[in-house]
A protein has these predicted regions:
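Membrane-embedded alpha-helices and immediately adjacent juxtamembrane helical segments
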Residues: 1-291
């Protein structure tokens, strides 16, 4: 046998041995089985496809609601937070908004009706999120009889953006202020993403699983947003220079895609941890499930 062929054969044998060893660890040890469940869960939920679908719904449902609400309320803090994240210059938007008087009766009546329609159409985001949770946790999807849950979750997610804007404004620019802002943001996300799966699964999950999902989601979102504040403004400026407004759209959707991957991935990982054979899994399942 030639040396080249011998090297290839030895390489294949080594790869097969490593693969067999990895499979043995994944199937033969509790941590390995948990990792295997995480991988299988992410594949089964189709992480990339679900995240892109959720990101598109956020872009077309949640952001319009925040922008529309900012015209009639103090939710401009939410839009400023988004602008700061992406590095968008809001001068043109502010000039456009200043041309309209929200106190005018005709404009106010049309605006309230439009805001209501935006909120109703915005439930497409929460319907998509509900289907994702239903598939992950194997629970029945929400029917039209529980449609109020869709609207409550939508308003909760939108309001959290405004609340985070308030926290960032109050905290100030100093190091201590930034630390408080991060902790406040983490707390807001933890509450929001504990309540959201509770509502969208109709209370089918235990409190421990809900809090674990909320904390894991909040941690991921906080890290992504912190990193985004560093890299996104430059990326947005570059994309806008090269592609114009479409560049801002592409960058925004990419950012929302990363956030959506955290939302979907955190729920999937929490389920895998809840099925773990260790103390953590037994704790998340609770006394009744472990009996």
């Amino acid at each position: 046998m030639r040396p080249t062929k011998l090297s290839v054969a030895l390489g294949r044998e080594a790869l097969a041995a490593r693969t067999e060893s990895a499979n043995g660890w994944l199937q033969g040890t509790p941590p390995g089985r948990t990792v295997r469940r995480v991988i299988d869960g992410l594949i089964d939920i189709e992480l990339a496809d679900r995240s892109m679908s959720l990101a598109a719904k956020i872009f077309t449902s949640v952001l319009p609601l925040i922008i529309a609400a900012s015209i009639f309320s103090n939710w401009d803090l939410a839009t400023h937070a988004i602008e700061e994240q992406l590095g968008i210059d809001s001068t043109d938007l502010s000039a456009w908004a200043s041309e309209y008087d929200a106190t005018d009766p005709t404009f106010a009546a049309f605006g309230v009706l439009g805001l209501l329609l935006v909120a109703i159409s915005g439930t497409s985001f929460t319907r998509t999120l509900a289907r994702i949770y239903a598939k992950i946790w194997n629970v029945p999807p929400i029917s039209a009889r529980d449609a109020w849950r869709w609207l409550v979750v939508l308003l909760l997610v939108a309001a959290s953006a405004a609340l985070i804007g308030v926290i960032r404004q109050v905290s100030g620019p100093h190091f201590v202020g930034r630390s408080l802002a991060i902790l406040g943001e983490l707390a807001v996300w933890a509450v929001v993403w504990t309540v959201c799966p509770y509502l969208l699964t109709r209370g089918a999950l235990s409190g421990r699983v809900l809090w674990a999902t909320g904390m894991l989601t909040a941690s991921g979102l906080t890290v992504i947003r912190a990193a985004g504040r560093i890299v996104l403004p430059k990326l947005t400026a570059t994309a806008e220079t090269k592609f114009g407004p479409l560049g801002v759209v592409f960058t925004s959707i990419s950012w929302l895609f990363a956030l959506s991957m955290v939302i979907v991935g955190a729920a999937t990982i929490t389920k895998a941890l809840a099925l773990d054979e260790s103390y953590l899994g037994r704790y998340l399942r609770g006394p009744s499930a472990g009996a």
